[in-house]
């Protein structure tokens, strides 16, 4: 069972809460998000079910925090599971940091990896609101597919066209 979980960006905290509930009592989550207000929306629910002690919330930009932690050695743990749901243009940067922090045989999961099916659509057919994230997601998929250090399993969960 995973004990250490790293979460990048979480909106209102629903999946953060469900993950905290699933972790053992001594499980730890490092949650990084530049929007404290979003965390505060879910905080009363996190407190109500008694899992606040599992969550270390960091109100900041994930790239700079992780670079600092890796450089200064302030992050003295390996993670069993990393979930990235952040700015799509930085997914490859997040991957490079995550690979240094996740245990051997650990899991790194990315949200929107199929980007509502747009990654296999002709560019002209992609709705405008999906265009901004489409190219970085395609680049990440190519990057991961060519990386011999990892195994890939893609699962579509509610990310449908």
Stretches found by the model and what they are:
Residues 1-161:
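S-adenosylmethionine/decaboxylated-SAM
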């Amino acid at each position: 069972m995973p004990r250490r979980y790293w979460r990048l960006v979480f909106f209102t905290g629903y999946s953060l809460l469900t993950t905290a509930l699933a972790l053992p009592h001594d499980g730890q989550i490092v949650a990084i998000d530049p929007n404290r207000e979003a965390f505060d929306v879910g905080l009363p629910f996190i407190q109500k079910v008694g899992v606040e002690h599992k969550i270390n919330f960091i109100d900041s930009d994930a790239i700079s925090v992780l670079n600092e932690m890796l450089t200064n050695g302030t992050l003295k743990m390996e993670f069993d599971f990393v979930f990235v749901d952040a700015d799509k243009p930085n997914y490859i940067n997040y991957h490079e940091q995550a690979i240094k922090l996740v245990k051997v045989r650990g899991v790194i999961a990315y949200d929107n990896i199929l980007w509502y099916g747009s990654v296999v659509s002709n560019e002209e057919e992609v709705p405008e609101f999906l265009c901004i994230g489409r190219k970085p997601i395609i680049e990440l998929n190519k990057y991961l597919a060519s990386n011999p250090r990892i195994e890939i399993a893609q699962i579509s969960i509610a990310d449908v066209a």
